[in-house]
Amino acid sequence: MKVKTRFAPSPTGFLHVGGARTALYSWLFAKSQGGEFVLRIEDTDLERSTQEAIDAIIEGMEWLELNWDEGPYYQTKRFDRYNGIIDEMLTDGRAYKCYCSRERLDALREGQMASGEKPRYDGKCRDSAHDHPADAPHVIRFRNPTEGSVVFDDHVRGRIEFANTELDDLIIRRTDGAPTYNFCVVVDDWDMEITHVVRGEDHINNTPRQINIYKALNAPVPEFAHVSMILGDDGAKLSKRHGAVSVMQYRDDGYLPEALLNYLVRLGWSHGDQEIFTLDEMIKLFSLDAISKSASAFNTDKLLWLNNHYMRSLDPAYVAKHLAWHMENQKIDTSKGPSLPEVVTLLAERCNTLVEMAAQSRYLFEDFEAIDEAAAKKHLRGVAAEPLALAKAKLTALDTWTTEALHELIEATAAELGQGMGKVGMPLRVAVTGLGQSPGIDAVMALVGKERVLARIDRALAYIEARMAAE
């Protein structure tokens, strides 16, 4: 049997981290079994579904590189298929017309709740549809079994059983003629030959209802794995108040897809004590049965740690492709300056996100408007004029503009003045970057370039001269 899984989001909002983890688990299981992965857009909620949400879901999947083998399929384009089956079910009695008014159903629900009963349809029209004019407003309900139970072995939660008496007759077609979610899902899984359904635990109550529909259609019943919810670090359900919950918000906040995928796979799944997983390792090691039943808490600090790891360990050329988006987003013109892979190599150790990296790289491409006041006050004093002037003279004569050559030049300048490296390096750092902290100033100057370095030293010397005159 060829394994086939699916990710089937509803386009009523953006792709959030819970959905992304579900997609990842479903994708990993398919790939680990040599199977196929299907993307299906469940857009039967015509009022809430939007093209913007569809685009965001696809953009999120593409950014994570969770590529699909089939799809995207859209349920709204398959209404004829669903309605054709519903008509067959009406003909042979597997479904029936229900003429109950909204007022009657509301009163029924209120009465059941008042008496402590579980709200459910009472089957009034189950055998009395002929008492109404055929063209009167109605819905179509599935004739659910009234005896026995539904039992299924969930890959995460073990054996689950529901008595059929707890399940009411689902509406499978609305008054406006639109088929409903629970019915469309079953037909889609049947037609698309889905073998395993991986989804959130909030769907557990839908599962027995859907299994009964599979059986009524004589369709194979897939296996199920219902994964737990993701909580915030305070133990509450993850929401917007915990920070980013949309996948693309993490892109905007400077995370690499590898970091988010690595983090998400560990939110409920583990392999020993291993923390870092490449995608190939995930595929090799992943299994549904190793998913935890317990809810997982989202920890942003852990995600930042992973992001820093991948910024440092991945090929700088690859990281640079993602950095380019942030440089453009922060309106940094990279046409004149070092290459972005060089920027990644310089700054990766010092940054947790690509947003930070882009911001910290600005002085490599643009002249800064002002020098940091605290850094200037401490390091651009009168005593710094001589080291800066001597360094400038040596830099002007330097033919080989490399990190190594610049390091030797700073050492030689300090030695000639009989001072420590810091007495030369710190004034140079503030002069060249405008900041009190940066990577090694030799590496920084190598990327800033000779012309800009000399101009910035001149600016610093002018600052010192003006400061001394004012004192």
From Swiss-Prot:
Subcellular location, record wording: Cytoplasm
Reactions that this protein is recorded to catalyse: tRNA(Glu) + L-glutamate + ATP = L-glutamyl-tRNA(Glu) + AMP + diphosphate
Note accompanying the cofactor annotation: Binds 1 zinc ion per subunit.
Short sequence motif named 'KMSKS' region, residue ranges: 237-241
Binding, Zn(2+): 98, 100, 125, 127
EC annotation from Swiss-Prot or TrEMBL: 6.1.1.17
Binding site for ATP: 240
Gene Ontology process terms (BP): glutamyl-tRNA aminoacylation
InterPro entries referenced in this protein's UniProt entry, alphabetically: aa-tRNA-synth_I_cd-bd, aa-tRNA-synth_I_codon-bd_sub2, aa-tRNA-synth_I_CS, aa_tRNA-synth_I_cd-bd_sf, Glu-tRNA-ligase_bac/mito, Glu/Gln-tRNA-synth, Glu/Gln-tRNA-synth_Ib_cat-dom, GluQ/Sye
GO function terms (MF aspect): ATP binding; glutamate-tRNA ligase activity; tRNA binding; zinc ion binding
Motif segment ('HIGH' region): 9-19
A GO term from the CC aspect: cytosol
Listed cofactors: Zn(2+)
This protein's UniProt keywords: Aminoacyl-tRNA synthetase, ATP-binding, Cytoplasm, Ligase, Metal-binding, Nucleotide-binding, Protein biosynthesis, Zinc
Lineage: superkingdom: Bacteria
Function in brief: Catalyzes the attachment of glutamate to tRNA(Glu) in a two-step reaction: glutamate is first activated by ATP to form Glu-AMP and then transferred to the acceptor end of tRNA(Glu).
Family, as annotated: Belongs to the class-I aminoacyl-tRNA synthetase family. Glutamate--tRNA ligase type 1 subfamily.
Complex formation: Monomer.
Protein name, as recorded: Glutamate--tRNA ligase
Provenance organism: Aeromonas salmonicida (strain A449)
Phylogenetic lineage: Bacteria, Pseudomonadati, Pseudomonadota, Gammaproteobacteria, Aeromonadales
Gene: gltX
